[in-house]
């Protein structure tokens, strides 16, 4: 049996760790949105609990999801009176955007 080069094993380990971190970001993004927004918006595949609240999986049909990045980090305010203001730190914004990008239906 030939010895596996150390560089290959290191690259494989980094790839696995990177994939694991990306999966954790997606789960964290989903959890943050569920906690902050799930009482009105569909965060996953189902219908939104509030009939006028758009499902997050269709946001990309209205505008680029990345456009939300600044608003989420600086404080998201809507003209809708029932929607509270939300502000997330940079790591949470990254996780939220990653999750939103992963669920978009085009």
Region annotations inferred by a language model:
Residues 1-3:
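N-terminal secretory signal peptides that target proteins for export/translocation
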Residues 6-17:
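Bacterial N-terminal signal peptides
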Residues 16-32, 52:
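Electrostatic cytochrome c docking/interface patches
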Residues 30, 45-73:
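Gly/Gly-Pro-rich "capping" loops immediately C-terminal to redox-active cysteine motifs
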Residues 66-86:
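Short Fe-S-cluster ligation motifs
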Residues 85-106:
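C-terminal capping alpha-helices of c-type cytochrome domains
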């Amino acid at each position: 049996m030939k010895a596996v080069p150390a560089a290959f094993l290191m690259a494989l380990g980094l790839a696995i760790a990177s994939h694991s971190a990306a999966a954790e970001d997606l789960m964290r993004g989903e959890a943050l949105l569920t906690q902050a927004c799930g009482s009105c918006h569909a965060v996953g595949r189902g219908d939104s609990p509030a009939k006028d609240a758009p499902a997050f999986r269709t946001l990309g049909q209205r505008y680029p999801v990345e456009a939300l990045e600044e608003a989420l980090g600086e404080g998201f305010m809507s003209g809708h009176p029932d929607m509270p203001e939300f502000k997330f730190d940079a790591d949470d914004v990254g996780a939220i955007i990653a999750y939103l990008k992963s669920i978009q239906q085009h």
